């Protein structure tokens, strides 16, 4: 993750909204191309172009927010010897992509909405991979904290 290869510069609020609108248009165009009955006054070629632009906007949006995922996952990655930093980062990226699918740019900045979801998914992932299957994520975090404190007290 050093330097985050492929990461693009952060988006301004205006760029974020513009990309989100392009993504929405691309999703709608893809739905029409897939046979959903929506009334549009566009040719197949125009719909294909709009769908491609939507996919490019989605990719740019995700790449521009990789630093957000790195920021959120840095607090969790590396604490558990069972789960690697790369695994935690990948889970964070998957969570970010999920948030983007339901993101409504009219309701605020992406980071405000995405950070809690990414953090929750990463914590749940680490808890489930750290040998605590079946334990709720918040309880796994508490157990981990208690074990860490107990180990520190024993070493003193």
Label every model-predicted segment.
Residues 1-134, 138-152:
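Alpha-helical promoter-recognition and RNA polymerase-docking modules of transcription initiation factors
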């Amino acid at each position: 993750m050093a330097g985050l290869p492929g990461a693009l510069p952060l988006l301004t609020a205006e760029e974020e909204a513009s990309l989100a609108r392009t993504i929405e248009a691309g999703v709608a165009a893809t739905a029409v191309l897939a046979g959903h009955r929506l009334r549009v006054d566009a040719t197949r070629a125009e719909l294909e172009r709009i769908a491609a632009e939507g996919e490019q906007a989605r990719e740019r949006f995700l790449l521009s927010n990789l630093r957000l995922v790195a920021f959120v996952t840095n607090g969790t990655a590396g604490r558990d010897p069972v789960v690697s930093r790369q695994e935690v980062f990948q889970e964070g990226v998957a969570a970010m992509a999920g948030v983007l699918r339901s993101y409504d740019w009219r309701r605020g900045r992406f980071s405000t909405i995405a950070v809690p979801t990414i953090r929750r998914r990463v914590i749940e992932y680490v808890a489930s991979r750290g040998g605590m299957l079946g334990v709720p994520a918040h309880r796994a975090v508490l157990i981990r904290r208690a074990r860490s404190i107990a180990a520190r007290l024993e070493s003193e």
